[in-house]
Amino acid sequence: MYNKNAAAPLPPMGWNSYDYYNTAVTEADVRANADYMAEHLAPYGWQYVVVDIQWSDPNAGALVPDVQYVPFTQFCVDDWSRQIPAPNRFPSSAGGAGFKPLADYVHSLGLKFGIHIMRGIPRICAHNHTPILGCDVTADKIANPFSISKWNGDMYGVDMTKPGAQAYYDSIFALYASWGVDFVKVDDIANTNMYAENPYSAQKEIEAIARAIERSGRAMVLSLSPGPAVIEKAWHLEQHANMWRITDDFWDDWRLLRAMFERCEVWQKHVGAGCWPDCDMLPLGRLGKGFGAERGTNFTEAEQRTMLTLWCIFRSPLMIGAELTKLDDATLALLTNREVLRVLTDGRAAAQVRRDEASCVWKSYGAGTAESVVSPPAAEKHAAGGLLAAASKRNAADARGAAGVDLALHHGLAKDVADGHGVWGIVAVLDDELVVGVPNHDVCFFVSFHTVVGQ
């Protein structure tokens, strides 16, 4: 039996084309970023190369910056109502090869390949009554014109009560399996925000997609967007998906980062193997070329540290949004810090300790578990813990300055510390308190090793 959790036992780490290229990434761009990842990032656990939205549109980006998505575009589809790569942008896909040559190249580097799709069936296929593989049904018979995206006009939702609906999803994921796809980001599905009264209106399509992946015979990470995901449906997301966005598009804006602490608190009990609430891409480095104006991130170095540390201690998937070939040394060093990445891969029982207008504190356990620290067995056990404290300025979310907060945190285990150090930030252990000084918008990250002796 297919175990969807086995597809993502750890939070996926990789690169996504959207933040830099918008809709207009090409095969050459993808290969260049894959080459960079293989050489500079793969040794640290980064492995997914994901082609984001509009890869089947030969004219994608033609109207930027005025219009993001070309209206009524004639994107590329095969004879069975399935989108295929635009060969003018992905030359190796010509002749029906699809993404297989590009996926093979990414795999040859020791990496994994992913794509973005929109929920539903192409409108042009519904309008042209094109057939669906495996059944005597045409696209118009399963298309639901009353289930559409608020922001992209390419697709109709699929009416899962209609004959042929599951066959359609089975056919597209069978195609992706034949290409060698390892990761699929499905958009307009975690929150169908066109319909405020029912933001989880695509529940049946989520189930159909999960079923199609199982039937494809290939393990694929299933990532659902956009957010915010519906917390009341956490049980359903955990059953069917590997990742789901807990926020709308996250960009390099301190207000969005500050709000992420609350979002992580809401979702902290739903993190585990194969189930990763997703804080969205990391907008650092060079961004925005495909949006009409290439630029550097608006986040300060302090804010970038805060972002990465929160993502890691919460155990969000990590998807770099930058153009990798233009990473500077400081950004590369941040993304390859083994100690903060170890909390992502090895952390357990991460939880918010406290949060107020001035600061937020999270704690995670490493080699041991929260339970082993609280109620240890008779033998000694070593547990590596990470603690994060991020500061902002009270009632001034956009303020940046040297002043911050000083926290005296009851560590509870300070007297058992055999070794400990700050990865970044100023930390001191006095008696049984952990004393932390944090500048505005910055973070303190402390790793300690405890010898826990049984009662």
PLM-predicted stretches and their roles:
Residues 111-126, 210-231:
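Aromatic-lined carbohydrate-recognition surfaces of secreted/lumenal glycan-active proteins
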Residues 295, 316-378, 384-386, 394:
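Glycan-recognition and catalytic regions of carbohydrate-active enzymes
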Residues 15, 49, 106, 222, ...:
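Conserved, mostly hydrophobic/aromatic
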Residues 1-31, 36:
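N-terminal module-boundary/linker segments of secreted carbohydrate-active enzymes
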Residues 37-198:
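Aromatic-lined carbohydrate-binding/catalytic grooves of carbohydrate-active enzymes
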Residues 430, 434-454:
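C-terminal beta-strand-rich structural cap/linker in extracellular carbohydrate-active enzymes
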Residues 379, 383, 389-392, 396-403, ...:
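Short linear motifs in low-complexity or flexible loops
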Residues 141-147, 155, 159-161, 167, ...:
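Glycan-recognition surfaces
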